[in-house]
């Protein structure tokens, strides 16, 4: 074990891809996010819309997982899940979360923090019906999400059983326990890797309805 840790300590890169100055960024952090996000899309990165979602229980126990961004406006950043999942339980107890986008080939990351609310039911329904049919079926049978199941075979059998049951239906109803959340941002941090670990970090904090820009120590 000590040899592994020693080896890891030797693994390091010098960040040379870019720089980030106050004069270069938008006054609105969502516009700044869209600029970076569109750059990541244009660079053909693998799933640049994947993001880490950090939540915490009422007792302060943190949980983090990767989810997919499914909407981004000034009103907030959307993702969908089972309301009975660990993330759903956490958000019912403690409706604050943080998102992290990491684009290593661009040497960039973005943190977005804020209050989380459920997306209106009709919006969740509309999105559900845009999903592939098999993904709709999976949402029905994967409950409670994160619950224990005896085997992969049992999960597959439930999936196939429901496939057969609904094959004649044109529309499959959205499960009541499934839908969307919207993180309403009050904090952003944009990170650009720089040489010698003197990274650029610019934060936007919402104070009295206005965004305030600060440079942070690396």
UniProtKB/Swiss-Prot annotation:
GO molecular function: FMN binding; pyridoxamine phosphate oxidase activity
EC number(s) from the headed UniProt entry: 1.4.3.5
Functional pathway: Cofactor metabolism; pyridoxal 5'-phosphate salvage; pyridoxal 5'-phosphate from pyridoxamine 5'-phosphate: step 1/1; Cofactor metabolism; pyridoxal 5'-phosphate salvage; pyridoxal 5'-phosphate from pyridoxine 5'-phosphate: step 1/1
InterPro entries in alphabetical order: Pyridox_Oxase (IPR000659), Pyridox_Oxase_CS (IPR019740), Pyridox_Oxase_N (IPR011576), Pyridoxamine_oxidase_dimer_C (IPR019576), Split_barrel_FMN-bd (IPR012349)
Residues involved in substrate binding: 12-15, 70, 127, 131, 135, 197-199
Cofactor note: Binds 1 FMN per subunit.
Subunit-structure text: Homodimer.
Function text: Catalyzes the oxidation of either pyridoxine 5'-phosphate (PNP) or pyridoxamine 5'-phosphate (PMP) into pyridoxal 5'-phosphate (PLP).
Matching HAMAP family: PdxH
Protein name as catalogued: Pyridoxine/pyridoxamine 5'-phosphate oxidase
Species of origin: Acinetobacter baumannii (strain ATCC 17978 / DSM 105126 / CIP 53.77 / LMG 1025 / NCDC KC755 / 5377)
């Amino acid at each position: 074990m000590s040899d592994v840790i020693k080896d890891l300590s030797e693994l390091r890169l010098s960040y040379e891809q870019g720089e980030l100055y106050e004069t270069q960024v938008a006054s609105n952090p969502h516009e700044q996010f869209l600029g970076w996000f569109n750059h990541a899309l244009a660079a053909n990165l693998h799933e640049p819309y994947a993001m880490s979602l950090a939540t915490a229980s009422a007792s302060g126990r943190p949980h983090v997982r990767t989810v997919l961004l499914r909407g981004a406006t000034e009103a907030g950043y959307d993702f969908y899940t089972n309301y009975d999942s660990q993330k759903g339980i956490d958000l019912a107890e403690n409706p604050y979360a943080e998102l992290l986008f990491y684009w290593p080939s661009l040497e960039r990351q973005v943190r977005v923090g804020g209050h989380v609310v459920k997306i209106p039911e009709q919006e969740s329904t509309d999105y559900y019906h845009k999903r592939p049919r098999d993904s709709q079926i999976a949402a029905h049978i994967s409950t409670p999400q994160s619950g224990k199941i005896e085997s992969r075979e049992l999960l597959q059998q439930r999936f196939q059983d429901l496939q057969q049951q609904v094959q004649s239906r044109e529309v499959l109803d959205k499960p009541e326990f499934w839908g969307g959340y919207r993180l309403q941002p009050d904090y952003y941090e944009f990170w650009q890797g720089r040489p010698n670990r003197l990274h650029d970090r610019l934060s936007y904090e919402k104070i009295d309805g206005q965004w305030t820009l600060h440079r942070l120590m690396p």
